Design a protein with these regions (language model features):
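Active-site loop segments of alpha/beta catalytic cores
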Residues: 1-182
């Protein structure tokens, strides 16, 4: 919702939070509309052959745990509830979510995406080992020398503890200038 409300990216999400706090009825009406549209879009992606879908929320980490619970979580639950019988893995990802990882689990998804700001083993304990996790290499590590990349990869794999259910991935999107060889 923030991109629509702000008109693009934002450093402080002033207009988004202003709407949440000063006009919660309009906020929830907008979020309900987004939830229904997103659910329909992801369902159509699945019908077209997608073998997994991901709900990617790149600004959710700017919310407090209380604000997430009140203003966002109910709408995210609607999305995952609307897709849970589609027969494909549902991935739930946000950045800066250490404080709300348990709530992300409660909101839904078969796989919880983990960014790079927390050790994988700590995050997985918070999420619960009955859920798969995806992540959590810092995308900027790909600009480091290969020996540093290997060291970071090995640390993440060690923290995964050979448990099933870890999808190794970046903890956010890859940058266009990332060296192809890395």
């Amino acid at each position: 919702a923030s991109y629509a409300i702000e008109g693009g990216g934002s450093r402080n999400y002033l207009h988004t939070k202003q709407m949440m706090y000063s006009d919660p009825a309009s906020w929830h009406k907008l979020m309900d509309k987004f939830a229904r549209v997103i659910t329909g879009y992801l369902r159509r992606q699945i019908q077209a052959g997608a073998q997994a879908v991901q709900l990617f929320d790149s600004w959710v980490g700017c919310l407090s745990a209380g604000d997430y619970a009140e203003y966002v979580k109910p709408h995210v639950q609607l999305i995952f509830d609307g897709l849970k019988h589609e027969g494909v893995p549902l991935i739930h990802f946000g950045t800066g979510t250490t404080a709300i990882l348990r709530q992300l689990r409660e909101a839904g998804g078969d796989v919880i995406g983990i960014d790079w700001r927390i050790h994988l083993d700590e995050a997985w304990t918070m999420v619960g080992h009955d859920r798969a996790v995806q992540g959590n290499l810092d995308p900027l590590v790909l600009f480091a020398p290969l020996h540093e990349i290997e060291r970071r990869v090995e640390d993440i794999l060690r923290r995964a503890g050979n448990r099933p259910g870890h999808i190794f991935n970046l903890g956010h999107g890859i940058l266009p200038t990332t060296p192809v060889d890395h």
